[in-house]
Structure formats: structure tokens, C-alpha cells
Amino acid sequence: MPTINQLIRKPRKDKPKRNKVPALQACPQRRGVCTRVYTTTPKKPNSALRKVAKVRLTNGHEVVSYIPGEGHNLQEHSVVLIRGGRVKDLPGVRYHILRGVLDTQGVKDRKQRRSKYGAKRPK
């Protein structure tokens, strides 16, 4: 442990804050083109086939992003908008695709939390 005099001579250094979504480059969202749409399995205690897409962004980055909701219409060459936000049980997936924007359709027959899934108000 340093003495007070040592701390006066050379103060403690702050740890640099790590950027959790580097591909967005401080933007709220980014547009990109799907290069591959596939399913993957989650980490140990969970079991499912999670839908993900590899997306090439307009800034040149290529990222893996999660497709939320039940069912989707995405395929290769679909233009999508991505936002930050990781999926805890999928390692390497740090972005979400926004539903109901550009080529991505909203979730069909969604009644609650519709704004998160790009679903229109039911009649």
C-alpha cells in the first residue's frame, strides 16, 4: 500500500472505461446488410435455437446481432437497423436488430410491449 507522500508524487490512475458497443461508434443505431441469417444455441443452463444474423454495417464493421421476437422475415441482403444491447446467454452477440424498421417486419399478433417489436395497434 502506498504512503500519502507516494500518492502525492504519483496519483492513482483511473481504469479506462471499456466500450460495450464499439461498432456503433457512439451512434444510437447503425444501418447494415445481413450477410448470413442462422440459429445458434445458448450457453450452459439454457437450451433453445436463438435467431441471429451477421450484419455488415455502413461503417465497414461486421457484427453478429440478435433477432428478437417470434418469427422473422430476414434473409441474406436484407437491410436492417441495429442497436446496442447484448444477449446474456449468447457469447459474442452484443447488438439487437430493430423490428418494424427498413426490411425487418414487426412481430405478428403482438399485443403487449408492441413498440419493442414494431407491431401496430390491434383493431
UniProtKB/Swiss-Prot annotation:
Q: Which gene encodes it?
A: rpsL
Q: Which family does it belong to?
A: Belongs to the universal ribosomal protein uS12 family.
Q: What function is annotated for this protein?
A: With S4 and S5 plays an important role in translational accuracy.
Keyword Iron on entry: no
- Domain of life, per lineage: Bacteria
Database matches in CDD domains = Ribosomal_S12
Annotated region Disordered: the residues are: 1-21
One GO cellular-component annotation of the UniProt record comes to: small ribosomal subunit
> For bias kind Basic residues, which ranges apply?
9-20
Spell out which residues are annotated as carrying 3-methylthioaspartic acid. Answer: 89
Pfam families referenced in this protein's UniProt entry, alphabetically = Ribosom_S12_S23
Any idea which UniProt keywords this protein has? Methylation, Ribonucleoprotein, Ribosomal protein, RNA-binding, rRNA-binding, tRNA-binding
Q: How does it assemble?
A: Part of the 30S ribosomal subunit. Contacts proteins S8 and S17. May interact with IF1 in the 30S initiation complex.
- An annotated GO BP: translation
Ribosomal protein among keywords: yes
Spell out the molecular function terms from Gene Ontology: rRNA binding; structural constituent of ribosome; tRNA binding
Q: What is the name of this protein? A: Small ribosomal subunit protein uS12
